[in-house]
Each structure stands twice: as structure tokens, then as C-alpha cells.
A protein has these predicted regions:
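A short coil-to-beta-strand element that immediately follows conserved catalytic motifs
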Residues: 84-92
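Cationic, low-complexity basic patches in intrinsically disordered or flexible, solvent-exposed regions
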Residues: 13
């Protein structure tokens, strides 16, 4: 098993063997998975944090080894904003095709706790949806926020490149059987 860090302590190269048609094939994977949540409160405001790196965004972060997506999201929101949430829906996913980073987006309901900052959030606040659209400026974060706020009951998937930001492929899917 190799270790190709590329700057992220959680991004490790893992070699696995799979059996296809009776044969053994070695495949190297270096994917990193993150989760993010659009958190609504009882006033239909959404939670934004001010990241030192990307400016205003919704909370989220890395899926750590041994965690489910849901556990990771609940932990990240608590760490970054100090609040407890209930995950209410799956919104979609996107992939950075240059760095094999997969981002998974959920909707959440605020259930308790006091807003507080952390080393990953210089500011934390509840804002109206329209205000949020003006505050978020990082291109990928803005694209994902537009999708999160669409409320069209579809699952959104897209691939992108980051420098310069551009959508490579995009598709929306109906939820359930069609």
C-alpha cells in the first residue's frame, strides 16, 4: 500500500485487488471525500461560516476513516459552527476531475446549540437565502449553493475543474423511479 499525500493528511493512496471475470487486478485509488450541509433554522434562514480560505460558505469537511457520510457531516457542522443538526435530504454530488475530490451535499435542519466560531470559521451567522447568494463568492461554492437552494427535488451531479473553474459535465436526476 502506497501513500501519496499531495498536501492533505487524509488523502492516501490505497491499493486494492478486485476479482473480475475470475482474475485479479490491482487498482490504485487516491480519492478524497467531503460532505457539506445547507442548514435551515425555524425562520428559513441558512447557516453560513466564513472560511479563512474561501470566504463565506456552508459548513462541511472531510469524511474521516471509519465514519459514515452522515456522521462526518454532523461532526463537521458541530466543529465549525457549534450547532446540532438533523440531516433531512440528499441534494447531490460533484467531483473535481483534476484532483479526484468528491463533494457530497445534504440539506439539514437546525435542532439546537449556540453559534460559535472555530479555527475553520472566522464568523458564523444565519442569513436569508438571497443574502447568502450575494455573500458566497468562491466559484465552486457558489455553484453548489445555487443547486442547494433550487429546491427542485432533483439530485444534481456534475464534474468540474478548479483552475480556472469550469463545469465539465452536468446532469440532474429525478428522485426514485421514473
Amino acid at each position: 500500500m502506497g501513500n501519496s499525500n499531495r498536501g492533505c493528511p487524509f488523502l492516501k493512496q490505497t491499493e486494492i485487488q478486485i476479482g473480475i471475470f475470475g482474475g485479479k487486478y490491482k487498482m490504485n485509488y487516491t480519492h478524497f471525500v467531503s460532505v457539506a450541509g445547507l442548514v435551515y433554522n425555524e425562520n428559513e434562514e441558512i447557516l453560513l461560516i466564513k472560511s479563512p480560505w474561501r470566504g463565506w460558505e456552508y459548513p462541511g469537511g472531510m469524511v474521516e476513516p471509519g465514519e459514515t457520510f452522515q456522521e462526518s457531516l454532523i461532526r463537521e457542522i458541530k466543529e465549525e459552527a457549534g450547532v446540532d443538526v438533523e440531516i433531512t435530504g440528499f441534494i447531490g454530488l460533484c467531483k473535481n476531475i483534476e484532483k479526484d475530490i468528491v463533494n457530497i451535499d445534504f440539506s439539514c435542519k437546525y435542532i439546537g446549540g449556540e453559534l460559535m466560531t472555530s479555527n475553520e470559521s472566522a464568523e458564523v451567522r444565519w442569513v436569508k437565502k438571497q443574502e447568502a447568494l450575494g455573500m458566497v463568492t468562491f466559484p465552486l461554492t457558489k455553484k453548489r449553493l445555487d443547486i442547494m437552494l433550487s429546491e427542485d427535488n432533483r439530485v444534481h451531479c456534475f464534474g468540474f475543474k478548479k483552475e480556472p473553474f469550469g463545469i465539465i459535465a452536468e446532469q440532474d436526476f429525478m428522485v426514485g423511479k421514473v
